[in-house]
């Protein structure tokens, strides 16, 4: 196999995974980065469309993996037309086992391609109560995958301890601020450009406004 270090990014076409993609490209070079996108039965096709467009636009190979069988065994607001709300400690947008599945399938693919580094955009700081976005889960999954496949994976989570404001700052540092602002999709309701009301849109816009305010203030003080 090619000895050149390569990376694969778990990629949804959203703000976080696109930021990770730019990070991977900066570190490994665009020719050595691939993305894996999952069709898991999400309510809106726009997520898959955005992911495909960005991958093509940036010139990275995209592999689409169908894990929609999960719809037959779990229920949530990400895959069904229902009101988004908090249910106990976890919002009903949480998809049981999703990130575990994503990491498992990505690892299987990565090993076949001779890739050891996997990027995922999960974040514990603004994680909305999703247990599979925690650092302890990712580290546990990394160990499990290494043991399961007798292969040394390195799961990278560059956003793990960043707030959304800091994620926007990282995008700016990577030279991708405008690109991510214009081309990524985050809305739970599938609205192009965002609905401005769902938890995901609110978190994204709050972080954006905080970063722009801080950046403007910093420029004035120079």
Swiss-Prot record:
Record's catalysed reaction(s): 7-carboxy-7-deazaguanine + NH4(+) + ATP = 7-cyano-7-deazaguanine + ADP + phosphate + H2O + H(+)
InterPro entries: QueC, Rossmann-like_a/b/a_fold
Cofactor section: Zn(2+)
Keyword Metal-binding listed: yes
Organism, as annotated: Actinobacillus pleuropneumoniae serotype 3 (strain JL03)
High-level lineage: Bacteria, Pseudomonadati, Pseudomonadota, Gammaproteobacteria, Pasteurellales
CDD domains: QueC-like
GO molecular function: ATP binding; ligase activity, forming carbon-nitrogen bonds; zinc ion binding
Superkingdom of source: Bacteria
Originating gene: queC
Record-linked Gene3D superfamilies: HUPs
A Gene Ontology BP annotation from the UniProt entry: queuosine biosynthetic process
PANTHER family on file: 7-CYANO-7-DEAZAGUANINE SYNTHASE (PTHR42914:SF1)
Annotated family: Belongs to the QueC family.
Residues annotated for Zn(2+) binding in this entry: 187, 195, 198, 201
Binding site for ATP: 11-21
Keywords linked to the UniProt accession: ATP-binding, Ligase, Metal-binding, Nucleotide-binding, Queuosine biosynthesis, Zinc
Cofactor note: Binds 1 zinc ion per subunit.
Pathways involved: Purine metabolism; 7-cyano-7-deazaguanine biosynthesis
Protein name per the record: 7-cyano-7-deazaguanine synthase
Enzyme Commission (EC) number: 6.3.4.20
Free-text function comment from the UniProt entry: Catalyzes the ATP-dependent conversion of 7-carboxy-7-deazaguanine (CDG) to 7-cyano-7-deazaguanine (preQ(0)).
Residues spanning the membrane: none
């Amino acid at each position: 196999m090619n000895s050149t270090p390569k990376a694969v990014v778990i990629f949804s076409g959203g703000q976080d995974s696109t930021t990770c993609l730019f990070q991977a490209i900066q570190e490994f070079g665009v020719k050595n980065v691939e993305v894996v996108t999952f069709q898991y039965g999400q309510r809106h096709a726009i997520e898959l469309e955005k992911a495909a467009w960005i991958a093509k636009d940036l010139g990275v190979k995209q592999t689409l993996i169908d894990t929609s069988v999960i719809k037959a065994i779990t229920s949530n607001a990400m895959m069904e037309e229902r009101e988004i709300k908090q249910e106990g400690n976890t919002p009903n947008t949480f998809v049981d086992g999703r990130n575990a599945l994503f990491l498992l399938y990505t690892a299987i693919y990565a090993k076949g391609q001779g890739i050891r580094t996997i990027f995922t955009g999960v974040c514990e700081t603004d994680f909305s109560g999703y247990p599979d976005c925690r650092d302890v889960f990712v580290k546990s999954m990394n160990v499990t995958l290494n043991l399961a496949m007798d292969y040394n994976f390195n799961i990278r989570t560059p956003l793990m301890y960043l707030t959304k404001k800091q994620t926007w700052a990282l995008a700016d540092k990577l030279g991708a601020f405008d690109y991510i602002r214009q081309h990524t999709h985050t809305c739970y309701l599938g609205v192009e450009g965002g609905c401005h009301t769902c938890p995901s849109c609110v978190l994204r816009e709050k972080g954006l406004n905080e970063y722009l305010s801080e950046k403007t203030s910093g420029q004035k003080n120079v």
